[in-house]
Amino acid sequence: MDVVDSLFVNGSNITSACELGFENETLFCLDRPRPSKEWQPAVQILLYSLIFLLSVLGNTLVITVLIRNKRMRTVTNIFLLSLAVSDLMLCLFCMPFNLIPSLLKDFIFGSAVCKTTTYFMGTSVSVSTFNLVAISLERYGAICKPLQSRVWQTKSHALKVIAATWCLSFTIMTPYPIYSNLVPFTKNNNQTGNMCRFLLPNDVMQQTWHTFLLLILFLIPGIVMMVAYGLISLELYQGIKFDAIQKKSAKERKTSTGSSGPMEDSDGCYLQKSRHPRKLELRQLSPSSSGSNRINRIRSSSSTANLMAKKRVIRMLIVIVVLFFLCWMPIFSANAWRAYDTVSAERHLSGTPISFILLLSYTSSCVNPIIYCFMNKRFRLGFMATFPCCPNPGTPGVRGEMGEEEEGRTTGASLSRYSYSHMSTSAPPP
């Protein structure tokens, strides 16, 4: 039996569905003959094995890298570590108990495993969603409200939030071990098989439950993340625009100074006020002016590097969010659809559509490590450093790569449009 399918199939109306001829890959009608497709088991085994291996390898590698490299244990990476653990849990505890019963056409692992697998799957999805919401809010605070967020943007606070998300998720998903049970059915050879099904007492409870999950795991988190990342994108755009204006103004002032002599006015940010000094004073202040210009160039370069690092992190997190919803929204939408209109849902989703939806839901467990590897340099360095056989690419804890290493200091504040100019000149880069 397909364990993810236990979220989609509640076990009700099995007989009526078979009588109507809605045969599919979800074991609605195992007691009814249907054409055999010899290539389907091979393709199913291949795809599930590929996703399983990628998920186990990728998430284990992410966990290992973050544990071994202390300088990578930033606030955001702590949430990503929790995300990797939940994905690994989904893979290990659910996929084998999904594929094997699907191939054998019988859930052979017993009632306890049926309850455990559905419970862990629901919990892992909930933890992943709550972690993504926490990451988006943490990023919003670090970039848009750097000074106000310094109080709570700490590793200890992140650990408390993660502990709360896990406890909340385990609490919310308690109906799964309570109402998941084995449902017997008669096979074609007149032997009795079992299906693992999530059975609520009545249709009203079924509809309420799936609507509740759709709200707390997708609609509300989706709105929160879209607003947070939208405000972050706006803040980054304003910072880039403000920096471009300042650089253009500085270049114009430099050109004007070179052509018409020293200027009397300055904006107080990037250029120091200058006078008409005597030759002796100019000669004495030349080294100091050169040092000041060098510091300003370092500040400008540091601000640009920090800004680009933050943009890379935001792109990575946005892709994670989009792919997560792309993978899980179909199955939860299908759950809600079937809860309100069982016959129509089974008619349209039976066969290939539901098979694709179920496989897509498991793909979420392997995409996050791929995103880390391709979109973040520090993770790539950490991946290579994990293996002794690989050449040492250097310490993966180089500052500025992830953009969170300096949270709460000048880096986080420098991305605010108004602190962008003042914080960058208040002190040299640490």
UniProtKB/Swiss-Prot annotation:
S-S pairs: C18-C29, C114-C196
SUPFAM superfamilies, per database record: Family A G protein-coupled receptor-like
Stretches of the chain found on the membrane's Extracellular side: 1-41, 105-115, 179-210, 337-351
Lipidation (S-palmitoyl cysteine): C389
Any one cellular-component term (Gene Ontology): plasma membrane
Sugar-modified residues: N10, N13, N24, N190
Gene3D superfamilies assigned: Cholecystokinin A receptor, N-terminal domain, Rhodopsin 7-helix transmembrane proteins
Annotated Polar residues bias: 413-430
Cytoplasmic face of the membrane: 68-77, 138-157, 235-315, 376-430
Family label: Belongs to the G-protein coupled receptor 1 family.
Protein name: Cholecystokinin receptor type A
Species in which this protein is naturally found: Cavia porcellus (Guinea pig)
Record gene name: CCKAR
